């Protein structure tokens, strides 16, 4: 395997100078090796890290220790979204995804947002919720009173579980309690509000819930059953905003089309499901690339969207100049320590490419990516339709499935797109003609 030569001019004291721009015109036209060289120079990847990207990223012995009954590893394409300027910093965003056009769409949206200064973001903090279910209570409201009266004791007991987290400024910060009606009668639900710092937080929160459960049983006289983290991270929100200049994105008609598409999603849950799915295309791809629990992120996002009726996670408005202003608010329980983020070699490399060191920064980037992905989808729907870009890339997959290799792939795709026949049988027919 040929090892790429990295341009050491971009290094200083062994670290990359991140003054390089993520705006890389023609990046998609480069070969895989040329793209990786650009990324390696941007992120300061070592020769060993470059080799890991080009070879099997997850060794079988590591995979066998991660989950049960391992028989192999399953790979996804790893792409790079370019052009992202977030809070004044340039990012190349790694995305692991099988769906065509997602990476290209995000890059194009980021290029348009960049014309107006890129994305600005906000983060509410790394607070997670641990739930303790208290049942069999004669007087649920009296039990709630007792929990809140002794919340300092509960917090102290919870923090005994993780002195290191407490020393870092994290730990259990508050207690909430509420009585709910269920088909099994009234229950008291106690929430531990835990600052998990740079972790996703499941292990720390679950351990705390289990630790304080006996004490809560004792002071309430009830029976505790579930003691587990909630994936609705309502206190761990990431927000992003971007202004899309009307002239850059195609004019007033495009702005109106996007606003009409947004209005459709805000009024109709059938459309809204697809609207929010498009947001998660980008975010989940980033989560997979960085070794985060994308199922937890998906669950939290859709649950948050459903509070008060299922609604879009993004909003769009038109400013006084006629430009489109997009915003997003989404729960973002991500981590940069623990779990697969430090076990999977490619996850570690993805975090290095991204250049983030904290969960907060990763959450901010994810929110910006989700907004970019959603804007790109709405713009495509409001103009040429989503299928054009999808089908051109789908044609490439079909050409490969038909057996095309090397330059044959481009020729088969060109003919299928020209003839408007994006089908596997036609791909095979075209390939047969080319080879005859």
Curated annotation (Swiss-Prot):
SUPFAM superfamilies: NAD-binding domain of HMG-CoA reductase, Substrate-binding domain of HMG-CoA reductase. It catalyses: (R)-mevalonate + 2 NADP(+) + CoA = (3S)-3-hydroxy-3-methylglutaryl-CoA + 2 NADPH + 2 H(+). The keyword Calcium does not apply. Signal peptide: none annotated. InterPro entries: HMG_CoA_Rdtase (IPR002202), HMG_CoA_Rdtase_bac-typ (IPR004553), HMG_CoA_Rdtase_cat_sf (IPR023074), HMG_CoA_Rdtase_CS (IPR023076), HMG_CoA_Rdtase_NAD(P)-bd_sf (IPR009023), HMG_CoA_Rdtase_sub-bd_dom_sf (IPR009029). GO terms for biological process: coenzyme A metabolic process; isoprenoid biosynthetic process. PROSITE patterns: HMG_COA_REDUCTASE_1, HMG_COA_REDUCTASE_2, HMG_COA_REDUCTASE_3, HMG_COA_REDUCTASE_4. Gene3D superfamilies: 1.10.8.660, 3-hydroxy-3-methylglutaryl-coenzyme A Reductase, Chain A, domain 2. Keywords: Isoprene biosynthesis, NADP, Oxidoreductase. The active site is at residues 99, 277, 293, 390. Pathway: Metabolic intermediate biosynthesis; (R)-mevalonate biosynthesis; (R)-mevalonate from acetyl-CoA: step 3/3. Converts HMG-CoA to mevalonate. Belongs to the HMG-CoA reductase family. This is 3-hydroxy-3-methylglutaryl-coenzyme A reductase. The lineage of its organism: Archaea, Methanobacteriati, Methanobacteriota, Archaeoglobi, Archaeoglobales.
């Amino acid at each position: 395997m040929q090892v790429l030569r990295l341009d050491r001019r971009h290094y200083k004291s062994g670290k990359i100078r991140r003054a390089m721009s993520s705006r890389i015109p023609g990046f998609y036209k480069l070969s895989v090796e040329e793209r990786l060289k650009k990324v390696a120079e941007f992120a300061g990847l070592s020769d060993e890290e470059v080799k890991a990207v080009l070879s099997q990223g997850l060794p079988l012995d590591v995979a066998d220790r991660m989950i049960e009954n391992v028989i192999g590893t399953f790979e996804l394409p790893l792409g790079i979204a370019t052009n992202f300027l977030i809070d004044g910093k340039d990012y190349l965003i790694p995305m692991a995804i099988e769906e065509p056009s997602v990476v290209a769409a995000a890059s194009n949206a980021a290029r348009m947002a960049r014309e107006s200064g890129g994305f600005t973001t906000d983060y509410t903090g790394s607070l997670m919720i641990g739930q303790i279910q208290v049942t069999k209570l004669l007087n649920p409201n009296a039990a709630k009173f007792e929990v809140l009266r002794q919340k300092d004791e509960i917090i102290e007991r919870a923090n005994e579980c993780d002195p290191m987290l407490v020393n870092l400024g994290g730990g259990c910060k508050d207690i909430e309690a509420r009585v709910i009606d269920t088909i099994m009668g009234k229950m008291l639900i106690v929430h531990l509000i835990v600052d998990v710092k740079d972790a996703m937080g499941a292990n720390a929160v679950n351990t705390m819930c289990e630790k304080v459960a006996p004490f809560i049983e004792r002071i309430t006289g009830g029976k505790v059953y579930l003691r587990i983290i909630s994936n609705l991270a309502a206190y761990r929100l990431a927000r992003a905003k971007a202004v899309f200049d009307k002239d850059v994105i195609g004019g007033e008609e495009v702005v109106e089309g996007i606003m009409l598409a947004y209005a459709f999603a805000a009024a109709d849950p059938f459309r809204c499901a697809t609207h929010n799915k498009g947001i998660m295309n980008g975010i989940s791809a980033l989560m997979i690339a960085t070794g985060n629990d994308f199922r937890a992120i998906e669950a939290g996002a859709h649950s948050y969207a459903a509070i008060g009726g299922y609604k879009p996670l993004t909003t769009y408005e038109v400013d006084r100049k006629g430009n489109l202003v997009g915003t997003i608010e989404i729960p973002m329980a991500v981590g940069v320590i623990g779990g697969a983020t430090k076990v999977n070699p490619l996850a570690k490399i993805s975090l290095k490419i991204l250049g983030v060191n904290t969960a907060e920064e990763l959450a901010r980037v994810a929110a910006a990516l989700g907004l970019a992905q959603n804007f790109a989808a709405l713009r495509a729907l409001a103009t040429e339709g989503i299928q054009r870009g999808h089908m051109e890339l789908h044609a490439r997959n079909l050409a490969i499935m038909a057996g095309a290799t090397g330059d044959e792939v481009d020729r088969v795709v060109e003919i299928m797109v020209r003839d408007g026949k994006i089908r596997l049988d036609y791909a095979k027919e075209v390939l047969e003609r080319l080879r005859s």
